[in-house]
Amino acid sequence: MRKIDFKKIGLAAMMLLSALTFQSCDNDNDTDWDRVFPNALVTVKKSGDACYLQLDDNTTLLAKNLKPTIFDGKEVRALVNYSQTSEKSEKYNQVIHVNWIDSILTKKPVPSLGSDTENSKKYGDDMVDIVRDWVTVAEDGYLTLRFRALWGGQKVHYINLVTGVNPENPYEVELRHNANGDPQNYWRDALVAFNLNGVVPDTEGKTVKLTIRWRSSQGYKEVDFDYCSRKPISSPKMLEGYSQEGRDIR
């Protein structure tokens, strides 16, 4: 994901991201607003003793002030606010200083059980909306989504991406939401990243259409993402369902 100018982020997104990362932020005249909001969506990776961030398919950022043990040394998607430094690296495109970083719920897709009825029983069929936003994107072998649903704050919700729903098109998937009986009291946004690497067929360098379907508050919808498999790398092990925040969603 290219670096983002936070001034161009919509107010709703800014409020969401502020709530995720700065739950108790002093509101004074000394606030450095350039550091309050995220300026990039990245994949957190490690290589030996180094922690680096994958900004897009071709750009890597060496985070010198992060240890490779961050997030238990697992690969996750994350929102980050960083500053460039004057240092150079032969291995990475840029050397950066991370001002703050916050992981996104990161998980693998789940397989279809063969029918809509069985998928609904297992993965749920509650309403969910995908929000058009700068963090809703397919890149680095991940599908990252900002989504919106009704919450009651009493039960854990489950969000899953179901693969294998169309035997004729392996790049067709479904987003499933299980509210787990939680009362529908208010709308709330959340973020999730699905690791498609090794789950859907390798596109072998080509860009294909990844179609996602879901049951929205206005009926069934679908949208296409441009998807290209990650370039071959030695990737750390994925941590299923890891998230620092959002303990009421899995």
Model-flagged regions — what are they?
Residues 20-24:
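C-terminal motif of bacterial Sec signal peptides marking the signal peptidase cleavage site
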Residues 2, 35-250:
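First exposed extracellular module after export/assembly in secreted or surface-exposed proteins
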Residues 26-29:
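Bacterial signal peptide processing site
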